Amino acid sequence: MDPNTVSSFQDILMRMSKMQLGSSSEDLNGMITQFESLKLYRDSLGEAVMRMGDLHSLQNRNGKWREQLGQKFEEIRWLIEEVRHRLKITENSFEQITFMQALQLLLEVEKEIRTFSFQLI
């Protein structure tokens, strides 16, 4: 896994956890949880690709991995839309920078997950 992506995830999660968005703090906590889940999923796919030929192990561990992959892409799309919405409504420059970086990271991770999944198919 790219060390820059790891530090980007950690940096964005740390900054998002410090943000105070008033009544929408539950939504933000949900976004943080989904970011963490997405990172773990991306890492596990990356590890499977690194071990090439580990497709059978992945399928045995999770017989519905294609369905799970589709769900992760739906989560990514939802997160992208949510981050874009937050970016439009916030006036705080710290939050704008954080959400812009989160959006960039989501697009990068979506591309990486697509690449990993094509290698596993």
UniProtKB/Swiss-Prot annotation:
- Give the residue ranges of motif Nuclear export signal: 12-21, 85-94
Q: What is any Pfam family matched here? A: Flu_NS2
Alphabetized SUPFAM superfamilies for the sequence: Nonstructural protein ns2, Nep, M1-binding domain
Which UniProt keywords are listed?
Host nucleus, Host-virus interaction, Transport, Virion
Q: Which domain of life is it from?
A: Viruses
Sorted alphabetically, the Gene Ontology BP terms of this entry are:
exit of virus from host cell nucleus through nuclear pore
The entry's cellular-component GO terms read: host cell nucleus; virion component
**Coiled-coil residue windows:** none
- Quote the subcellular location field of this record: Virion; Host nucleus
InterPro entries linked to this entry: Flu_NS2
Q: Does the keyword Transport apply?
A: yes
What HAMAP family does the annotation carry?
A: INFV_NEP
Misc. remarks from the entry: Average number present in a viral particle is estimated to be 130-200 molecules.
Function per UniProt:
Mediates the nuclear export of encapsidated genomic RNAs (ribonucleoproteins, RNPs). Acts as an adapter between viral RNPs complexes and the nuclear export machinery of the cell. Possesses no intrinsic RNA-binding activity, but includes a C-terminal M1-binding domain. This domain is believed to allow recognition of RNPs bound to the protein M1.
Per the record, the similarity remark reads: Belongs to the influenza viruses NEP family.
Instruction: Provide the assembly information.
Output: Interacts with protein M1. May interact with host nucleoporin RAB/HRB and exportin XPO1/CRM1.
Protein name stated in the entry:
Nuclear export protein
Q: What organism does the UniProt record list as the source?
A: Influenza A virus (strain A/USA:Phila/1935 H1N1)
